[in-house]
C-alpha cells in the first residue's frame, strides 16, 4: 500500500515554551491522562502553551476497536474514585476558565462510566464554579439513563462525535452505530434543551463532499449546536489509511455550509480536532445564557 505525503498545510512548527512544561508537570502531579497525548493530537503544543488540555478520565485503555484511533485497546483498569477530585484540582492549578473532559469507552461498566463523568462535573463546579465545562462522552450503548446522569450534572456543553459519514462506519467504527450516535445527541436535548450539544467529523477517510454535507444535515436534524471538522491523520500503518489530504479551501466550503444550515459555532480546518479551541465557545454560551 502506498502512503500519501503530508502537504505543507499540515506541517507544524513547534516553539519551546515554559507553559508546556508547566502543564505536563501539573498533569503528572495529579496522575492524569490527556487525550492530547494519548491520541497524538497535532495541536498538543499549541494547546499546552495556552495552558489548556482535554482530560482523559477512566483510564487510558478503551473497550472499542475503532480503526482510526491510537488510544490503547484491551481490558481497562478499575476506576479511581479520587479522579474527579484530582481533575478539579488540576483545573484549579491551571486556572482554566473552560475545561474539556473526555474518556475512553468503558463498555465494561454498568453505566458506561456516566456516574464518573457526573462526579467529575460536580467536583469541578465545587472548586471552580465559574469554569465552563464541556464533556465529550462515548455513546453509552445508547442508554438514556446513562446520558441522563451526565446531563443532570449540568455541564455547559455535551459533545459526542459521529467521527465519520454513515457509509464508513463498518470499517472505521465497527462497534459503534451512526444512528445511535445521533440519538445520543437527541437525548441530551430531550433531557435539557438549555445544554449545548456538539459533534465532530474527520475527513480524508474516503468520504465524498455530499456525504459530509449529509452528515452535517443529520447533526442539525438532531439539534446539534456546534461542530468541528478536521483532517484524519493515520496514527500508524496498522490503522485506517488516509485516503485524501483535504485542501483548506474544502474545509472553508464545509464551514460555510454548516453555518448556512444553522450551526451556532463551526471550527473547520486541516488541524482542527473535536476539542481544538473549544474555549472559543465560552462567549457564545455566556451570551445565550443572558437571553
UniProtKB/Swiss-Prot annotation:
4Fe-4S found in the keyword field: yes
Pathway(s) the chain acts in: Protein modification; protein lipoylation via endogenous pathway; protein N(6)-(lipoyl)lysine from octanoyl-[acyl-carrier-protein]: step 2/2
A GO molecular-function descriptor: metal ion binding
EC number: 2.8.1.8
Keywords per UniProt: 4Fe-4S, Cytoplasm, Iron, Iron-sulfur, Metal-binding, S-adenosyl-L-methionine, Transferase
Domain Radical SAM core: from-to ranges: 48-264
A Pfam cross-reference name: Radical_SAM
Claim: Iron-sulfur is one of the keywords in the record: yes
Cofactor descriptive note: Binds 2 [4Fe-4S] clusters per subunit. One cluster is coordinated with 3 cysteines and an exchangeable S-adenosyl-L-methionine.
Cofactor(s) demanded: [4Fe-4S] cluster
Top-level taxonomic group: Bacteria
Catalytic reaction(s) noted: [[Fe-S] cluster scaffold protein carrying a second [4Fe-4S](2+) cluster] + N(6)-octanoyl-L-lysyl-[protein] + 2 oxidized [2Fe-2S]-[ferredoxin] + 2 S-adenosyl-L-methionine + 4 H(+) = [[Fe-S] cluster scaffold protein] + N(6)-[(R)-dihydrolipoyl]-L-lysyl-[protein] + 4 Fe(3+) + 2 hydrogen sulfide + 2 5'-deoxyadenosine + 2 L-methionine + 2 reduced [2Fe-2S]-[ferredoxin]
UniProt-annotated location(s): Cytoplasm
Binding site for [4Fe-4S] cluster 2: 62, 66, 69
Main localization of the protein described in the UniProt heading: cytoplasm
Residues that, per the record, bind [4Fe-4S] cluster 1: 36, 41, 47, 275
GO terms for cellular component: cytoplasm
Residue ranges that the Swiss-Prot or TrEMBL entry lists as coiled coil: none
Alphabetized PANTHER family for the sequence: LIPOYL SYNTHASE (PTHR10949), LIPOYL SYNTHASE, MITOCHONDRIAL (PTHR10949:SF0)
The family this protein is said to belong to: Belongs to the radical SAM superfamily. Lipoyl synthase family.
NCBIfam families registered for this protein in UniProt: lipA, PRK05481.1, PRK12928.1
Stated name of the protein: Lipoyl synthase
Organism the protein comes from: Caldicellulosiruptor bescii (strain ATCC BAA-1888 / DSM 6725 / KCTC 15123 / Z-1320) (Anaerocellum thermophilum)
Amino acid at each position: 500500500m502506498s502512503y500519501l505525503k503530508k502537504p505543507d498545510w499540515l506541517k507544524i512548527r513547534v516553539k519551546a515554551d515554559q507553559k508546556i512544561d508547566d502543564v505536563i508537570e501539573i498533569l503528572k502531579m495529579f496522575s492524569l491522562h490527556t487525550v492530547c497525548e494519548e491520541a497524538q493530537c497535532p495541536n498538543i503544543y499549541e494547546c499546552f502553551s495556552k495552558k489548556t488540555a482535554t482530560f482523559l478520565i477512566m483510564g487510558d485503555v478503551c473497550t472499542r476497536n475503532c480503526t482510526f484511533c491510537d488510544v490503547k485497546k484491551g481490558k481497562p483498569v478499575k476506576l479511581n474514585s479520587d479522579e474527579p477530585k484530582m481533575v478539579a484540582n488540576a483545573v484549579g492549578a491551571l486556572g482554566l476558565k473552560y475545561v474539556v473532559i473526555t474518556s475512553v469507552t468503558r463498555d465494561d461498566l454498568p453505566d458506561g462510566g456516566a456516574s464518573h463523568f457526573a462526579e467529575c462535573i460536580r467536583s469541578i463546579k465545587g472548586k471552580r464554579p465559574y469554569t465552563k465545562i464541556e464533556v465529550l462522552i462515548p455513546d453509552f450503548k445508547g442508554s438514556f439513563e446513562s446520558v441522563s446522569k451526565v446531563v443532570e450534572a449540568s455541564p455547559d456543553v455535551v459533545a459526542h462525535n459521529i467521527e465519520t459519514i454513515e457509509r464508513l462506519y463498518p470499517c472505521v467504527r465497527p462497534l459503534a452505530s451512526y444512528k445511535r450516535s445521533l440519538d445520543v445527541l437527541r437525548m441530551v436535548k430531550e433531557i435539557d434543551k438549555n445544554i449545548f450539544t456538539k459533534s465532530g467529523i474527520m475527513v480524508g477517510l474516503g468520504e465524498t463532499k455530499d456525504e459530509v454535507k449529509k452528515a452535517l444535515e443529520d447533526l442539525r436534524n438532531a439539534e446539534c449546536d456546534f461542530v468541528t471538522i478536521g483532517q484524519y491523520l493515520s496514527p500508524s500503518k496498522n490503522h485506517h489509511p488516509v485516503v485524501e489530504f483535504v485542501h483548506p479551501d474544502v474545509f472553508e466550503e464545509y464551514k460555510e455550509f454548516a453555518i448556512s444550515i444553522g450551526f451556532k459555532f463551526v471550527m473547520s480546518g486541516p488541524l482542527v480536532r473535536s476539542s481544538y479551541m473549544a474555549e472559543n465557545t465560552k462567549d457564545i454560551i455566556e451570551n445565550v445564557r443572558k437571553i
